[in-house]
Amino acid sequence: MLSRRSAFPLHASVLVALLAASSAPTPLYALYQAEWHFSAMTVTVVFSAYALALLGALLTAGTLSDHLGRRPVLFGALLAEAVAMAAFATAQGVAALIAARVVQGLATGVATSAAGAALLDFEDPGRPGRATLANGITPVAGMAAGVLASTALVQYAPAPTRTVYLLLLTVFAAQAAAVLLTTETAHPRSGAWRSLRPGIAVAPASRPAMKLLAPGVVAAWALGGFYSSLGPSLARLIAPHASRATGGLVFFTLTAAAGLAVLAARTLPARTASFAGTALLIPGALLTLSAPHPHSLLALFAGTVLAGTGFGAVSQGALRLLLSPAAPDERAGTLAAYYVLSYLAMSIPAVLAGLLTNLYGLQRAVSLYAVTVIVLTLAGLARTARQPSSV
């Protein structure tokens, strides 16, 4: 059996791998488009198939590990993730790509809440706050690692649409085997079938923070969804003759900046981190909005850095405010509720952006998207400023 000390980094690596797999297709969309001849709208549908499937899993199975145990739930989800990677590697068209994204989303939704709760369970009592920090940084670190590896393979590998998925399949299979060697930390209890009824289980003590943080979280993840789905297309619009890797580097820049912000924000009060991060989304969105007009990649990447920094700070502050007051048996549900809100914010606006791109062109869609994010951000800042600091 793995020791408690070894189990913590294992579950952190699971979250990194899950989010690496979620971002791996981003640099490949241009290759898929060139081979299968589909539109920007189809790109956002493929992207959102993953996010909506993940939402369905969180709404139904987000608390399943509280009832059945972390270990069996996580083992099954990782095996399903490996199946999804095999489906990606063998996909021959858009329908197969969407199907693989759906399987991946379901598996990730189940695994994310279970692994995140396990991190809290395995936290060293002598190092409080480490699990919340890990829950904040592993998703963005995973997305950064996934998009960077995929971008490198696009540039240098002979079969980039297969290689990255076969590597991830191997990782998930190894992690599934390692999870079986960990100690079970949840105490299985009855009610597993009832827990599958769609619903959101936010800890009562965390509900005021959820209401306060919602606009900022929605704005941050909506901006992240844009960069993930249409970031490469925007880079090609601005610099049509740039390297194929440029589109992937846009999303890598976002996630790398977010990861650094999570680390920096851990020393700030949680509410301060969330407020400052929300404020940074405004200049990030404005620079992104302005980038197509002078055809400036510098403006795009500067906006991406600001947006990523805001994204990371918002995520770090929000997770600390939400998870700190939750009881141990409320953690998985509260974490799942946070991800439900986040992925709704990430997927629905991205689909609308794809529709707007088809109707009016990418440049106008970028403008409308940026304005929407700014309005949400201002609403979040106003709500935070009005609430007492004790909330």
Predicted regions and their residues:
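Helix-breaking motifs and short loop linkers at transmembrane-helix boundaries and internal kinks
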Residues: 37, 69, 90-95, 158, ...
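Cytoplasmic helix-loop-helix junction between adjacent transmembrane helices
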Residues: 100-139
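Helix-loop-helix hairpin linking two adjacent transmembrane segments in secondary transporters
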Residues: 130-180
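Transmembrane alpha-helices of Major Facilitator/SLC transporters
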Residues: 247-270, 284
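A late C-terminal transmembrane helix in Major Facilitator Superfamily
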Residues: 311-313, 318-370, 380
